[in-house]
Amino acid sequence: NKNGTAIMLIGVLTFTAQAVGITFDLASVITIILVGLFLETGSGGIPGGGLIIALIFVKAFNLPLEIAAIVGGIYRLLDMGITTINVMGDMVGTIIVSYSEKNISQRL
């Protein structure tokens, strides 16, 4: 349900890390994926909530919040794309379940 949020979290973390010149090893990448998964799953569906989750995500890896806060200036624009990705993911999931339960016409 929150595919867009997961993508945005990784994008903000990558942007912040590159801005300060930090690289991640394989263990860090696995940790990033797991922490991102937990934060994305636990985030609420409130407008602007993804930005707060992104700041928590950045702080969890001891990166400066000031750089990640730059994203806050354009978050409204990002949120439109994030919402679109979330809705498209939900629609695809619904269509797959409908086909598997044979509740949908084959003409779709």
Ranges and model annotations:
Residues T41-G44, P64-I67, G81-N86:
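Juxtamembrane membrane-interface segments at transmembrane alpha-helix termini
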Residues T16-V20, F38, A54-L65:
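Interfacial segments of multi-pass membrane proteins
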Residues N1-E40, T94, I104-L108:
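Helix-loop-helix junctions within the multi-pass membrane cores of secondary transporters/permeases
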Residues I74-Q106:
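Membrane-helix cytosolic exit motif
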Residues G4-I10, G44-A54, M88-M91:
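Transmembrane helix boundary and interhelical junction motifs in multipass membrane proteins
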Residues N3, L13-T16, L34, F61, ...:
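Hydrophobic transmembrane alpha-helices
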Residues F57-K59, E66-A68, G73, V92, ...:
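Canonical bilayer-spanning transmembrane alpha-helix
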